Amino acid sequence: MMMMRGGERVKEFLRPFVDSRTWDLCVIWKLGDDPSRFIEWVGCCCSGCYIDKNIKLENSEEGGTGRKKKASFCRDDHNKHRIRTLACEALSRFPLFMPLYPGIHGEVVMSKSPKWLVNSGSKMEMFSTRVLVPVSDGLVELFAFDMRPFDESMVHLIMSRCTTFFEPFPEQRLQFRIIPRAEESMSSGVNLSVEGGGSSSVSNPSSETQNLFGNYPNASCVEILREEQTPCLIMNKEKDVVVQNANDSKANKKLLPTENFKSKNLHSERKRRERINQAMYGLRAVVPKITKLNKIGIFSDAVDYINELLVEKQKLEDELKGINEMECKEIAAEEQSAIADPEAERVSSKSNKRVKKNEVKIEVHETGERDFLIRVVQEHKQDGFKRLIEAVDLCELEIIDVNFTRLDLTVMTVLNVKANKDGIACGILRDLLLKMMITSI
């Protein structure tokens, strides 16, 4: 009820803007039951009701039937008129509910700062000027078909006045309680002072005041309760007393339903939910097996995946432990054999070093019809590269390019070669090169 009364007062305040033809129409919105989701239509003002009344409007007829088609009425209920202007048509297209996000309405409500939008040349927009002004628990929009210069004073005036209109009246904030012998107090002149809701004085009460309590001639106490519980006013014959009922206000605060709770900072609440959703999306991206897309399903799948990783980790640790034990046993056996026969150990170590020293690794890959890639890894020593080139030449291969890389005492040579004849296999070429390299050492 308070919102409807405030909307009527806002329409009365905004109507002169439309009457003066400064703006073509205005729309009033209020925040819905969930302020962070949608806004609801409250009312509007249209300039279509102020066209020349001497113009005769005829109902259009449908061809062939002779039936008259009734024109629809404009949504502005201040002065009932039919849809006959662009402003009326634009109002008929507005929905009763509109989502806040994503859109310009949500930005204005969240930032609580007005926006003055001017459309310079786009044919998609019907209006050239559009103004969105945030007010208390609502939003005001003004539209014009032509371009309007920015008027900061008008915007501030609308914000201040409309916000005041939506605030509750002082008498809605008070609880009046008249204690015994109220009739005697009303018969004699008293002065009333109201704390927290303004001040007023009453002297020589009229017949209206007597009729107000005429229905309770034998009542010892009359209470007038309002929606909001605030300090109560006590009227006594001896003197005026203003007492604040703190206990009642605390009890009423405890009894407030949670459904009427409104967040003080919708922007921070929205950011918090976005962070939670982003974390959920990140968790869902990491877990490979997702059975359900709800929050409970994502968490349960993540727990199962972590348990699987722990089991796999334990298996790998056991396997690594077994490998280490085998290596330790082999080392211990070698040490025991070396202690038993040191001369044999010395001979075997020398032979192993010699084998490793003279080891040559060759890889051959076919890259084309006659093209081959040869990779040779050997010990870096004198005339090693020369022997490799000679072996390639003996195989009747043409060298296209050579890449030479050295690390400590190891050398890797990569050659791109081309054969002079067809039918050369990679395996045969590799064995031939390896044989030539070993015999030349």
Curated annotation (Swiss-Prot):
Major location category of this protein: nucleus
Pfam families found in the cross-reference section: bHLH-MYC_N, HLH
Compartment annotation: Nucleus
One GO cellular component, as annotated: nucleus
Tissue specificity remark: Expressed constitutively in roots, leaves, stems, and flowers.
InterPro entries named among the record's database cross-references: bHLH_dom, HLH_DNA-bd_sf, MYC/MYB_N, TF_AMS/ICE1/BHLH6-like
Gene Ontology molecular-function annotations: DNA binding; DNA-binding transcription factor activity; protein dimerization activity
SUPFAM superfamilies linked: HLH, helix-loop-helix DNA-binding domain (SSF47459)
Domain bHLH: 260-309
Residue spans crossing the bilayer: none
GO biological process: regulation of DNA-templated transcription
Keyword Transcription regulation: yes
Keyword set, alphabetical order: DNA-binding, Nucleus, Transcription, Transcription regulation
PANTHER family: TRANSCRIPTION FACTOR BHLH90, TRANSCRIPTION FACTOR SCREAM2-RELATED
Subunit field text: Homodimer.
Name under which the protein is recorded: Transcription factor bHLH90
Protein's organism: Arabidopsis thaliana
Highest classification ranks of the organism: Eukaryota, Viridiplantae, Streptophyta, Embryophyta, Tracheophyta
